[in-house]
Each structure stands twice: as structure tokens, then as C-alpha cells.
């Protein structure tokens, strides 16, 4: 008996991994391969937690110099400066703010959820910002991770009829790089329906297709 897509377990379609949007078979092919973390990723997590604490407490990251984050990472002046760059940017933005907001995009892709670093509502614009602590330059234009977070942030708002535009922002302190991209809300939702949903359905199929590409 041929296996149907109903027999396929729900894979977690991660916003940070765009391979499933480009190559539906990549998720099932990687099933069973353990996730590996790196020191850079763990430091990034520690810096995100430091920034979140400072934003919620209204204090400078310098106040945590000498402390440890995640019981492992010493907060040095250099690491404080990285967090401060992002904290200062967020603090200077007008609007209603939420930090490290859990978002779900499961109405577009089963199991697709994540955490948006900062979500800011101001007039008719919804800003979704992402702190990147690495040295590889990342741009906001057509950034699928941020676009998915944008869909999730909209889901978090009971009535988003007042929102006209989604502003997606990448903040990279170590590169002194801030990049932003604007997309109309209706265009983003259309992308969710016309790109994300079909890609998720193909990923969940019993025999998903493979479309290997450098971007995936």
C-alpha cells in the first residue's frame, strides 16, 4: 500500500531554514540527522537574551559586564557593545514594542513557528526586527525568515486591519549594518498563500520532489 501524505509526520518547518521553500524533499531527507550547534550560535543566543533583559528592564548592557549568560558566556565589554547597538536601535524606534515574541505561521505551514526578536506597531506599519550577531552580511529584502515572522506577527494581532505595511529590519552590530525592506501587508499575505502553503504541502507529501540549488 502506497504511503499517503496523511501518514507522514508533521515536520517542523523552521523559518530560519528556507530549504523547504526551495527544495521540498530536503526536510524528509534530513530526518534523523541531529541538529548541531556551534559556539557562534550559542553566543548569539546569549546576546539575544542579554538584549531582551536590557530592553525589558530599561538598563544598559554594560550593567551586565562580568556576569554570565546561559551559565557559560561572560559578558565582556565587546559583547556588551554588540547588544547595546541593537538595544539602542530598538529604544529609538517609536511605537508599541514586544520582545522575543513567539510567533506561529501554522495556518500557512504545519509546525512553522519561531521567535521574533522585536515586533513594533506604529501607526499603520508593523516592524519585525532581527538581531544578527555574526559577521556574514544579511539583507532584509526578500528575506524569507523575516517574511515568515511578519506573517506570524500579523497572526498575533487580533485585528490588524489598521496595518498597511510590514517593515522588515536586519540589525548587525558587528558590521555596523542595518538593512530594512518594506512590503505591503496584502502582498505578504499573498506570498503566504501562493508560496508558503504550496511549499509546505509539497514538503509534507509522501514522495516530495527534490530541487537542489545553492540557495537551498
Describe the role of every protein-language-model region:
Residues 14, 38, 75-76, 139-143, ...:
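Alpha-helix initiation/capping motif
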Residues 1-126:
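Metal-dependent nuclease catalytic cores that hydrolyze phosphodiester bonds in DNA/RNA
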Residues 94-207:
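Mg2+/Mn2+-dependent nuclease catalytic core
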Residues 78-92, 186, 191-196, 213-215:
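A cyclin-like helical interaction fold
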Residues 1, 52, 56, 190, ...:
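Accessory terminal regions of nucleic-acid processing enzymes
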